[in-house]
């Protein structure tokens, strides 16, 4: 269905116990004079939750018209996979991602102009000319989609174009550099000495480095080996030494090929037992290679295939036993925390997919106050650490944290370290529930719609803020 005809209203008897009279009168003022920009201004000044008590916002299932004379213009960029139903599993019957319209509308509500445009691999030059007029681009293309049904080199041509816009001072979210550097597992090595990092983190890009170093780290303590590719716990292995004691200090011992390991893959928590040589062979050459042994994992291994340039890498970190308490996901828009989510595993140690229960917390909550403060202290240094100086933070990204005891041994203190960044076309979960098939944005329940729009509206405000910063305003 099209946009709902709706009005702005206020409760008959506002609950003034939750806010001062000045705040309530200001909220009521915005309610009476509701325009896209003033609603965004109200949220920025009073907070989204406060404004929602007094302002019943419209629901829009279609793209809003951009305000006349908007100072900043943006576009949401999509790609439809040739021959795929709806243009891909992330699209609805109208050919759009379910979250594209709310993201574009978030920009409009914040006072900017925004359109949704498509990238066609056979109309690259036409697209390149069209995007010159925009102040910034919000790219909503899933990783790997540009290699489906397209001519060879499409991804590189698209990335080169995005980088050329960045060189002209135009933000692109998320840029190719941010996706490949911040989104890669070896980002954990680059933040190892920051508050959110784990000091004994190593990256391997070839078989020799993997074999030499892993035998030393594994001889000292339980480890976690993470592949760069894959998702939902695939290729993330918890590793324990089986039938042999760990050495007392790092570097004093190195394992033999015949030493035995207990391994748990995080995608489904299944356990396997292999020799060191079998595990290294699996990581390098796959389960069918000579000397790999017999594997229950249904995935192909070969984690270093293609080398560093192709994303072939493994990261080696200390195993943190408190992962059994679950992971903490921080959902961000630029430098602003939008939500904190505790993912508690239901059986096993993995908090992926349907194996976990979710509890949601608002920014500033007491439970994760120290985590939030620590993250905010690191954010200004984050992109520099990854050789991304001058790039804007992703417009939508997540950081998954694992709890641990204090590094200095202080009893009763919990610290958190990043296990993964995600900044490649992060989906908006409340919209994704109706993703694909014949359902559209109109099929999202009201409660989920308004909750998800808190995020997309924040993205609009943040996008304009980052454009201003890029222009030096």
Could you say what each language-model-derived stretch is?
Residues 70-74:
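Nucleotide donor/acceptor-binding cores
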Residues 3, 7-9:
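Phospho-regulated RS/SR low-complexity segments
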Residues 366-369, 377, 384-395, 403-473:
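C-terminal active-site "lid" helix and adjoining low-complexity regulatory extension at the edge
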Residues 79-85, 89-218, 231:
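Conserved N-proximal alpha/beta basic substrate-recognition cap immediately N-terminal to
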Residues 43-65:
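Repeat-associated, polar segments at repeat-unit boundaries in modular proteins
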Residues 234, 238-389, 402-411:
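Phosphate-binding site of ATP-dependent enzymes
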Residues 138-140, 224, 315:
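Structural motif
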């Amino acid at each position: 269905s099209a946009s709902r005809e709706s009005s702005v209203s206020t409760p008959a008897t506002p609950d003034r116990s939750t806010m001062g009279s000045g705040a309530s009168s200001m909220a009521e003022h915005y309610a009476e004079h509701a325009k896209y920009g003033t609603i965004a201004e109200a949220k920025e000044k009073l907070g989204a939750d406060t404004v929602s008590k007094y302002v019943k916002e419209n629901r829009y299932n279609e793209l809003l018209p951009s305000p006349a004379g908007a100072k900043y213009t943006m576009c949401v960029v999509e790609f439809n996979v040739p021959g795929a139903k709806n243009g891909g599993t992330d699209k609805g019957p109208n050919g759009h991602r379910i979250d594209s319209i709310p993201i574009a509308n978030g920009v409009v509500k914040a006072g900017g102009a925004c359109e949704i445009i498509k990238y066609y691999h056979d109309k690259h030059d036409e697209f390149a000319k069209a995007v010159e007029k925009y102040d910034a681009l919000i790219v909503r293309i899933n990783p790997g989609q540009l290699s489906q049904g397209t001519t060879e080199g499409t991804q590189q041509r698209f990335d080169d174009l995005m980088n050329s816009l960045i060189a002209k001072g135009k933000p692109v979210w998320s840029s190719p550099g941010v996706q490949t550097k911040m989104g890669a597992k070896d980002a954990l090595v680059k933040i190892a000495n920051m508050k959110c990092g784990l000091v004994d983190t190593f990256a391997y890009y070839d078989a020799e480095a993997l074999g030499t170093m892993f035998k030393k780290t594994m001889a000292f303590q339980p480890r976690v080996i993470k592949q760069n590719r894959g998702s939902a716990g695939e290729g993330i292995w918890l590793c324990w030494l089986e039938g042999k004691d760990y050495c007392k200090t790092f570097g004093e011992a190195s394992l033999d090929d015949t030493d035995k390991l207990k391994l748990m893959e995080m995608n489904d928590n299944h356990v396997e037992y292999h020799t060191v040589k079998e595990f290294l062979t699996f990581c390098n050459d796959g389960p069918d290679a000579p000397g790999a042994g017999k594997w229950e994992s249904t995935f192909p291994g070969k984690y270093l295939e293609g080398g560093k340039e192709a994303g072939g890498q493994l990261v080696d970190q200390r195993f943190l036993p408190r992962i059994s308490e679950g992971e903490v996901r921080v959902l961000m828009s630029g430098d602003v925390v939008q939500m904190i989510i505790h993912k508690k595993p239901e059986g096993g140690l993995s908090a992926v997919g349907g194996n976990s229960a979710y509890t949601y917390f608002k920014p500033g909550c007491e439970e994760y106050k120290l985590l939030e403060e620590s993250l905010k202290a690191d954010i200004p240094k984050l992109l520099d650490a990854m050789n991304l100086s001058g790039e804007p933070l992703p417009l939508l990204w997540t950081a998954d944290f694992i709890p641990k005891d204090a590094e200095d041994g202080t009893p009763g203190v919990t610290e958190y370290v990043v296990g993964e960044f995600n900044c490649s076309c992060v989906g908006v979960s409340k919209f994704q529930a109706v993703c694909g098939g014949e359902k559209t944005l109109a099929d999202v329940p009201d409660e989920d719609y308004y909750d998800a729009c808190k995020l997309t509206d924040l993205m609009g405000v943040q996008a304009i803020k980052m454009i201003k910063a890029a222009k030096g305003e």
